Amino acid sequence: MRTAGSILILGAGAILAAAFGPAAMACEGTPGRDRLILEVENVRSNQGLMTASLYPGDPSQFLVKNGALRVWSVPAHAPETRMCIFLPGEGNYAVAIYQDENSNHRWDHKIFGHFEPFGFSDDPRILFSQPSYDSVKFTAHHGETAIRIRLEHR
């Protein structure tokens, strides 16, 4: 049997979750003082997973196999998906992200045809080749750093 007190507590919890949900999201990785909040815009569906790769300040590690410090996924949420990861410390980083619409854990793309939506930190203009590290790097500071990434749909 529910009492007025338990209903009040449940209602207050729902209000707090709605008000503070994004700030209270779970962060990926080893807990620490520094963290990155990704706000992924232009998410057109709730289909699949949003998968992000965090790259270190070394340009030679960018977009190479095993070059990422961490790869993690969360369920996609339209129109914006928020993600969080703990960082090893302040410094330069880069992020590559894609919406894994079929949840097969890889970015599906064809030379001529469908691409799963993708994006990079600092939203560089993408034409026919991958972006340079310098065009996507950002500086994370102690505490919380938030960046916005707009998904490209092709």
Residue ranges and their predicted role:
Residues 7-19:
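Bacterial N-terminal signal peptides
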Residues 28, 117-153:
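Extracellular beta-sheet/turn segments enriched in Thr/Pro/Gly and aliphatic residues
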Residues 34-42, 52, 149:
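A short, amphipathic beta-strand motif
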Residues 51-55, 96:
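Beta-strand signatures of extracellular beta-sandwich domains
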Residues 73-79, 139-141:
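Short proline/glycine- and polar residue-rich coil/turn motifs
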Residues 81-88:
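Exposed aromatic-hydrophobic patches
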Residues 91-97:
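A short tyrosine-centered beta-strand micro-motif
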Residues 100-109:
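Acidic, glycine-anchored loop motifs typical of Ca2+
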